[in-house]
Regions:
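Conserved Lys-Pro-Asp/Glu-containing loop-to-beta segment of HAD-superfamily phosphomonoesterases
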Residues: 155-188
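Active-site neighborhood of HAD-like aspartate-dependent phosphohydrolases
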Residues: 55-98
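Substrate-recognition element of Asp-dependent hydrolases with the DxDx(T/V) motif
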Residues: 85, 89-125, 135-145
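Catalytic phosphate/metal-binding cores of nucleic-acid and nucleotide-processing enzymes, i.e., regions
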Residues: 78, 188-192
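Catalytic-core segments of class I nucleotidyltransferases/pyrophosphorylases
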Residues: 1-49
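Anion (oxyanion) recognition and catalysis
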Residues: 18-19, 90-94, 130
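Short, solvent-exposed loop/turn segments at secondary-structure boundaries
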Residues: 2-5, 77-78, 111-116, 154
Length: 193
């Protein structure tokens, strides 16, 4: 293959290995796209694949939506699930929605808990959900606040809701169907973003 500029999957890889009985197969009901030999076919296949991969997203605020908000919940010992949330996330997973948390975390900016505490809590949340075959696709957070006493967190950030920074990151990172997506929050800042 070293001398060839382009490889043809069928001609150069699959058929020679079939003839040598060095290839195994498995039947799938999914679609496959042959992107052909040219850039036009590649671009067409890319568009089709992106369309297939796009799916709606349910964005969730965290405190007050998935857990009780006792004020600055940043550690496992202060986290308590809201009733029905795990079941709702499982339903969204089964309906082929991305489920993404977008959460302001001023408690980090104020020094009530650390980013490490926050990540430990995320691990606990994910682990707890996985017991019920439920999952989150991503957790985005904003640790910044203009009134922070900690220099590295003291700033005005578009990540902080009602800014749209976390949503923009999600749209960049995932194939999200915007027209069918929604956000569930408990504050005006959630609705405004």
């Amino acid at each position: 293959f070293k001398n060839k500029k382009y490889l043809d999957l069928d001609k150069d890889i699959i058929w020679p290995h079939i003839n040598k009985k060095k290839i195994k197969g498995q039947i799938f009901d999914d679609q496959i796209f042959d992107i052909g030999d040219g850039i036009n076919e590649f671009n067409l296949a890319k568009k089709k694949i992106n369309k297939i991969l796009k799916k709606p997203c349910c964005f969730l605020d965290r405190d007050g939506v998935i857990n009780y908000d006792y004020g600055y919940v940043g550690k496992i010992k202060t986290f308590k699930w809201m009733p029905g949330v795990k079941k709702a996330i499982r339903y969204l997973n089964k309906k082929n929605y991305y489920v993404i948390i977008v959460t302001n975390q001023a408690g980090i900016a104020y020094g009530y808990y650390s980013e490490k505490d926050f990540y430990n809590l995320n691990s606990y949340i994910r682990s707890n959900l996985s017991e019920g075959k439920t999952y989150l696709d991503k957790i985005y957070f904003c640790p910044y606040h203009i009134r922070s006493k900690i220099k590295k967190y003291k700033k005005n950030s578009q990540l902080r809701k009602p800014g749209t920074g976390m949503l923009k990151k999600a749209f960049k990172d995932f194939h999200i169907l915007k027209s069918k997506s929604f956000l569930i929050g408990d504050k005006i800042s959630d609705a405004l973003c």
